[in-house]
């Protein structure tokens, strides 16, 4: 499947090269557009643990949630030939952002639907998040008022969290939810990092009416490589998960207004989703120096929303 994707990516320019006239140079340094914007990022990621020897049932889930994290975003688009363009873009958060985390366990196999342990960590932060993207666009329709094209690209997204303090309810010594307490507010409890590597294909479209322009983009991937690192500071245990060939879908839309022939103010919103899928876990206990790998024992699911407003300039 990966080979098919990269073949498609390489073929996009070739498909449309035949449409270029002999008077049109292969590269046009002047035909470049740039954009910069400020925006907001909200999302939720679910980190799950399963017990392979008990039918693969879920035994733990950590929900990391954040809202309205401030981001700065930028991009460059370069028309290589009339119907093919190359783009580079990315965004990053600005400083620590407020978040929350809930950790829930189901340790009793006799009542697998009833949670046994739960902790709440309102003093959680999204320490940083960022993304970069490379893509090629091949335009099937390329008129002044409307465009429709194929897109093939690659993007990487990173997220880093830190949970401090928190309160808990645990089941201990054969009891049920019989221990309640709280961690010191300044004590580190869990650190969590994610990395998503996403080759994708999709469709992109634009429509212009007078000074208004509308755009939409749909991206899909079945080849996502996800990985994470979960560090429990109290037990000195590190979990590393890897999930291959997850599904990814992104839908984006924007509207803009040209204040000059070369400058456009715009607003944009997107929804990004990576579906849940099981993978392998590697664990390491620092205190005992014990390590191991468990197959089909972890999963990652992610949903995120990004909105931004900015300016695009065409040279």
Swiss-Prot record:
Enzyme class: hydrolase
Family: Belongs to the peptidase A26 family.
Native source species: Shigella flexneri
Protein name: Outer membrane protease IcsP
Any GO BP annotation: proteolysis
Annotated localization: Cell outer membrane
Stored Gene3D superfamilies: OMPT-like
Membrane topology label: Multi-pass membrane protein
EC number: 3.4.23.-
Catalytic center residues: 103, 105, 230, 232
Pfam annotation, one family: Omptin
Chief location: membrane
Role played: Protease responsible for the cleavage of IcsA between 'Arg-758' and 'Arg-759', removing the entire alpha domain from IscA localized on the bacterial surface. This proteolytic activity contributes to the maintenance of a tight polar cap of IcsA, which is important to Shigella actin-based motility.
CC per GO annotation: cell outer membrane
Result for mutant: residue 225 to R: In plasmid pINV_F6_M1382
Signal sequence annotation: 1-20
Taxonomic superkingdom: Bacteria
Keyword line: Aspartyl protease, Cell outer membrane, Hydrolase, Membrane, Plasmid, Protease, Signal, Transmembrane, Transmembrane beta strand, Virulence
MF-aspect GO terms: aspartic-type endopeptidase activity
Induction text: Transcriptionally regulated by VirB (InvE).
């Amino acid at each position: 499947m990966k080979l098919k994707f990269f073949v498609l990516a390489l073929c996009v320019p070739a498909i449309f090269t035949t449409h270029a006239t002999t008077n049109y140079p292969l590269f046009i340094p002047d035909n470049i557009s740039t954009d910069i914007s400020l925006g907001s990022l909200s999302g939720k990621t679910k980190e799950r643990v399963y017990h392979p020897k008990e039918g693969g049932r879920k035994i733990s889930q950590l929900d990391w949630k954040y809202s309205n994290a401030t981001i700065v975003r930028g991009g460059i688009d370069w028309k290589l030939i009339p119907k093919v363009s190359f783009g580079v873009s990315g965004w990053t958060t600005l400083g620590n952002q407020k978040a929350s985390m809930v950790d829930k366990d189901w340790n009793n196999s006799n009542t697998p639907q009833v949670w046994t342990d739960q902790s709440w960590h309102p003093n959680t932060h999204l320490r940083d998040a960022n993304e970069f993207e490379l893509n090629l666009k091949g335009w099937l329709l390329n008129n002044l008022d409307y465009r429709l094209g194929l897109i093939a690209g690659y993007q990487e997204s990173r997220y880093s969290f830190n949970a401090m303090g928190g309160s808990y309810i645990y089941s201990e010594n054969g009891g049920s939810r019989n221990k309640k307490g709280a961690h010191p507010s300044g004590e580190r409890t869990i650190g969590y990092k994610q990395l998503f590597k996403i080759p994708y294909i999709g469709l992109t479209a634009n429509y212009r009416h007078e000074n208004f322009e509308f755009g939409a983009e749909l991206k899909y991937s079945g080849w996502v490589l996800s990985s994470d690192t979960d560090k429990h500071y109290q037990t000195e245990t590190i979990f590393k998960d890897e999930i291959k060939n997850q599904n990814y879908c992104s839908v984006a839309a924007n509207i803009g207004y040209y204040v000059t022939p070369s400058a456009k103010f715009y607003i944009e919103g997107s929804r990004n989703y990576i579906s849940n899928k099981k993978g392998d876990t590697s664990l390491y206990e620092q205190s005992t120096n014990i390590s191991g790998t468990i197959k089909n024992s972890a999963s990652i699911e992610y949903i995120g929303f990004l909105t931004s407003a900015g300016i695009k300039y065409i040279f």
